[in-house]
Amino acid sequence: MALEMTQRQGIVVWLYSLRQVKQLRRYGLVYYTSKRMKYVYLYVDADQAPAVIERLKKLHYVKRVTRSQRPMLDMEFGALAELANQETATKAALKE
């Protein structure tokens, strides 16, 4: 029996009040709650994300719902580190 990884999607739910945070648990895993900015970060299955977003938008205590952009970002930073090292080397050479 092999354990399969399910794809997850992060959803940011902006609220009018934080009283309903417990109610959001039925839609997904509440990962983080910001009391100051009044938002909740949820994780849901990627295949269920569009349906969950539509259900969340219909709730009266939800201000807005946005998807996390992290899956769309390129997480390879090796080339950027090399570029930064080259820039610092050229700046050091110019100072001398």
Swiss-Prot record:
InterPro entries recorded:
DUF2129
List the subcellular locations: Cytoplasm
Q: Which Pfam families match?
A: DUF2129 (PF09902)
Q: Does the keyword Nucleus apply?
A: no
Which keywords, in A-to-Z order, does the entry hold?
Cytoplasm
Q: Does the keyword Cytoplasm apply?
A: yes
Which Gene Ontology CC terms are recorded? cytoplasm
- Protein family according to the UniProt entry: Belongs to the UPF0298 family.
| Record protein name field | UPF0298 protein LCA_1075
Question: What species is given as this protein's source?
Answer: Latilactobacillus sakei subsp. sakei (strain 23K)
